[in-house]
Amino acid sequence: MNLLLLRPYYGITIFSDMMGDLGIAEYLPQVLPDLSLVYAATIAKNDKSVKLDIIDANAEKLFPKDVIKRMEKKYDVIILKGASPTIKYDIEFASYLKNNNYTSRIVLTGHTAKLLKNWISEHAPEIDDISEVPTEYYVNNMLGNKLPSLSIDAFPTLDYTLFPYDKYSLITGELRGSLYMSRGCAVGCSYCPYASFYGKKFDFRSVDKVIDDIKHLLSLGFTTLQFRDQFFTADRKMVFELCRKIIEQGLKFEWYCETRLESLDNELIDIMVEAGMIFISFGVESAEGDTLQSYNRPVYGLERTKGLIDYLHEKNVITLAFYIVGFPDETWDTLQSTYNLALKLASKCAVFNIYMPSLKEEELKEQYPGIEITPDLFMPFENTLNLKSAKNFSLEQMLELKTQLSFLYQANVPEPDALQDAFENHLNSSKKYVSAVKSLRSKLEEVSIMDI
């Protein structure tokens, strides 16, 4: 079988496996791997019946016409990984590849493709299949279920050598790789995209296999690793075991993780820092406790939350807090309360995102009667839906607010050169990105993706 795994590119960098595999657009000049594709490729590589090609156009900045030039043969199967910010163009590209006889079978994967399966089947019937499961599961099933189970603990040691891994770097130029110790989350926040794609459960990878993944990445020259777990410290015992083995085996690297802040304490933070943690992110979301509880989101206690953030800073860990704006009943008063909370907690960084409802069709239609799930629901090159989520604000106001709040926050952080940093790395970069997105969207309304 001649198989091509393809991550496309249309002019804007996409982190296609983030946000529960919906994908996000990235305005900074850095590229990260798609872990789902890395595992899919590793599984396929181990099957002797497969002749595997991989084109990570997102990493190599290859437009669709460049991808066509790179392809040297007709494939039996092309699997194209879609993402919310580009799904309209992903469908167009997949259709082009099939209609122009570059493949016998075209498959579209990713969370957004799953959500649009009915629409795609009706409006783009040339696309042979739309996966309803993660890409690596689809590949495993297609090859006859080579893995003993679909747990991430059954996955082989990921093989980055199949990809242009030298492109996976931070804006500083350092290589940054991604890996899992766990996937999924059992907490059950109703707006969480991870639960709707991976299920409301935890799936753990054994510590020894995680160590093998780390050693593989270090052998390739990666100096910074990001654990892509949605709740890294969900199993306290496993985190202690992992950190102890990193320390005992003398594995030297810096790492990032995301977790729920209330699961931390000083003892756990200490060993994580000793093992190399330099950056941690977590969701605070809103100052409105009643709002959070209505979405099944546990509420942090202010004093304990502030104490943990302060202790992380004492340990020289960079903290990033996520906040949500644009809940259906959002007002200027609730926005002000959330912004004031962010200032009180004083994480080193803060990101304000627009509320995204559950994308399960029955729940979405209950909240927004008459809505249809089509590609137009997903704004090109934006990390939000084309949807007025808040009764008191327009979508345009929300898009502007999320940028301005992030700028204002960074300008108020008590750090040297905070205002300059906020202007150069937040406001200025965001404005350049917004300008580029508007220009690209306008162009793609007039021409085919093959003409960019």
Give, region by region, the residue ranges found by the protein language model.
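Radical SAM [4Fe-4S] cluster-binding motif and immediate context
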Residues: 160-320, 340
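Short, solvent-exposed turn/loop segments enriched in Gly/Ser/Thr/Pro and often Arg
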Residues: 58, 83, 112, 228-235, ...
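Radical SAM enzyme core and accessory elements
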Residues: 2-5, 25-26, 46-49, 70-77, ...
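Short, electropositive alpha-helical surface patch
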Residues: 60-64, 240-246, 331-348
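Acidic, low-complexity intrinsically disordered segments
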Residues: 2-220
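A structural motif corresponding to the C-terminal end of an alpha-helix
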Residues: 40-52, 220, 249, 275, ...
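Conserved strand-turn element in the central/C-terminal portion of the radical SAM core barrel
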Residues: 287-296, 309-334, 353-357, 383-393
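Catalytic cores of alpha/beta
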Residues: 117-124, 268, 329-344
